[in-house]
Every structure is written in structure tokens, then in C-alpha cells.
Amino acid sequence: MAVVHRFAPDADLDSGTGTPVGDEGYNLYILNEAADWDYGDASSLVFSIWQRPWAHSWLILESPRDRLEFGHTGDLGQAKPRFHEGVYQKIRDGDPNPIAYLWQTMADGQLQIGKPNRPPTFVWRMPITRRRYQLIYEHVMERKYDQFGVRSNNCTDMVIETAALAGINLIHRIRLTWPPETKVLGRMRRVWTDPQYRILEYSSCDVLDMDLRQLARSGIGSDATEWYLALKH
């Protein structure tokens, strides 16, 4: 799902190239671990989610003095089953709308400070001004993190709203149309009975990953993956 305008009206852009500029030493990094799910059909998608249920997007805010790595995490599986586990459990139980589990909002969200336990598949760097740095820092510190969901309030949503504060709009949404039934582990299983669960739209690490790579190829921001992986954390 495309964005209408790539940059905010007040974005800090080079007058000649139209690309983002900033003050020396100030940068915003978007770190993305894509799930690389198979979106070919519903059965393939369900199987790939079962194999690789984890994906994550997070950020680094950098100034000449320090570097803050942070993100929004949740779906920890302590009070309730994790999203993918809850769906599969409802499928096994014969629930008429197992996919409806993804419409829940978990209450275990939290601010992640520091490096997560898995490396990113891609890191994108964008220069920002000192003013943008301060704006983003204050937003991150004041933002609420307790709510965490698939359809809203997920890790990618937090990255997207932070990027918007830096003056750039990123492509990140996906819309999935589920069939009423699909094959799961060799058997046809009910996905939904109530048609309100037919379409699932959410912010996707996979979609964001493709957009960030395209931006780097076109000279908007840059690929900082090797730089990040070489850091001594």
C-alpha cells in the first residue's frame, strides 16, 4: 500500500537533490528483521508463519554524544498465548473464527532499550537535524507502550510514527484477504465464519523492508547494515 507523499511538507531536504539532510552527527536508523513469509496463498502463508513467527522493527537515535537503540516489543506469551500460538490453538479446538485471535490487543507491551536478541536483515540510515533529534527523543520517552497488537500498536507502527517525526513517510501496510478455509498441516481447517475477519490489514516488517531497500537504492538514506553488524555492542 503506497504513500501519497514521501516527505512531510516541512522535511529537511537538500535543495538540489531533494534528499534528506541533517546536522553533523545526528542520524535516525531503522533496523528491520523481515520474516520473509510466503504470501503466495493462504496455506503457504500460514505454514511460513508457523515456521518463522518472529519479525521485528526497531530504531537507533544518534547524536554526536550518544546512541540510543530502542523499540516497541510485546506479545510475550506470559498472560496469554502469543498471537500465532493462539490462532493455532483455536484451529485445533475447532473455533469458528480462529483468525479472530489476531484482533486482540495484548497488555504486555513495553519499551525495548538496547539490542534485541536477533540481528536485523537490513539497516537504513537517514540524517536528521538536531531539532528532529530532540523531537523524536521526547516523543519516545513520553509515548505509552503497554498496548501491543497486530492490527495496530505493533513494533512497525512505532517505527513508522517515529520516521514521520523525522519528516519521511514509509510504505509499511499490507492487506490480506483470508479464505473461509485453508489447508493447515495437511488438513482443511476453518479460518473464519464471521466475514468481519475476512480481511486483515496491518503494518508489516516485510513490506517495510522492501521500502527501505528501495529508498537506499534510490539515494534516499543509505544502507547501514554492515556498519551495524560490525558494531561492538
Annotate the PLM regions:
Residues 110-138:
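A structural motif
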Residues 2-117:
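Glycine-rich catalytic cores of cysteine/serine-nucleophile enzymes that process amide/ester linkages
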Residues 11, 98-100, 122, 129, ...:
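Intrinsically disordered, low-complexity segments enriched in proline/serine/threonine
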Residues 2-16, 133-233:
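Activation targets extended, charge/polar-rich intrinsically disordered C-terminal tails
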Residues 30, 49, 60, 91, ...:
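Weak global preference for isoleucine
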Residues 45-48, 118-126, 141-150:
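Second-shell loop/turn segments in exported
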